[in-house]
């Protein structure tokens, strides 16, 4: 059970099982309700949000592993997986970084999708809902805002801002270890990405509710 829940090799299996569960629920909903089925559209939105997050995570970590292999090798503990050679071979590094990206983002994508669906739930005050296709248009904007905030975080990291509150980064700068400015730039990209995703999801939820209120006035 521990292998299934925590190992890297079972990650694809866990994601596949999740997709199959949602696909099965969607098929059951469609079989029962046919043209009146709605759940399958919601499950599709969740799957697309997860897929978008995975793509973002993989691309993000392909770029950042090029900027600082040290961040992944030392910071993410990949030295055992990649071997003693430094810098590590390019292809194994990028494959390992891709896996790190998938692990870090698939659950975030699920949370984004759930947040949008909850924001679109009918209530007594706002009974009308947006179409799921309208919600889908917000997902690319979420990742765009995430990328922009991540880029800002990367710039601030390159300037050495994290060293002001983290002694490890301060020591890296003092001893010029692991190309510290690049290391902190990647740290800033990742931290900024998490903050950006939270901000963007909040904005998307507010936008969803705003659009729903506009439906009432129309």
Annotate each PLM feature.
Residues 71-93:
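Perimembrane loop-to-helix junctions flanking transmembrane segments
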Residues 15-29, 143-154:
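Hydrophobic core of alpha-helical transmembrane segments in multi-pass integral membrane proteins
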Residues 2-22:
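Hydrophobic transmembrane alpha-helical segments in integral membrane proteins
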Residues 30-42, 113-140, 206-218:
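Cytoplasmic juxtamembrane regions at transmembrane-helix boundaries
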Residues 48-62, 136-160:
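Hydrophobic alpha-helical membrane-insertion segments
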Residues 11-16, 87-110, 176-200:
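Hydrophobic alpha-helical transmembrane segments
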């Amino acid at each position: 059970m521990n292998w299934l829940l925590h190992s890297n090799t079972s990650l694809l299996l866990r994601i596949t099982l999740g997709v199959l569960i949602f696909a099965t629920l969607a098929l059951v909903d469609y079989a029962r309700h046919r043209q009146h089925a709605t759940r399958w559209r919601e499950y599709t939105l969740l799957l697309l949000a997860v897929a978008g997050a995975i793509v973002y995570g993989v691309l993000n970590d392909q770029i950042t592993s090029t900027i600082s292999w040290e961040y992944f090798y030392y910071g993410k503990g990949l030295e055992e997986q990649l071997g003693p050679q430094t810098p590590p071979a390019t292809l194994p590094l990028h494959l390992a970084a891709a896996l790190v990206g998938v692990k870090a983002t698939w659950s975030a994508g699920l949370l984004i999708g759930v947040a949008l669906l909850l924001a679109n739930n009918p209530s007594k005050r706002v009974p009308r809902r947006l179409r799921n296709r309208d919600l889908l248009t917000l997902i690319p904007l979420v990742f765009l805002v995430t990328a922009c905030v991540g880029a800002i975080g990367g710039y601030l990291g390159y300037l050495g801002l994290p060293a002001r509150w983290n002694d490890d980064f301060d020591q890296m700068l003092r001893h010029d270890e692991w190309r510290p400015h690049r290391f902190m730039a990647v740290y800033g990209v990742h931290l900024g990405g998490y903050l950006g995703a939270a901000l963007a999801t909040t904005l998307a939820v507010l936008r969803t509710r705003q659009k729903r209120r506009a439906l009432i006035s129309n």
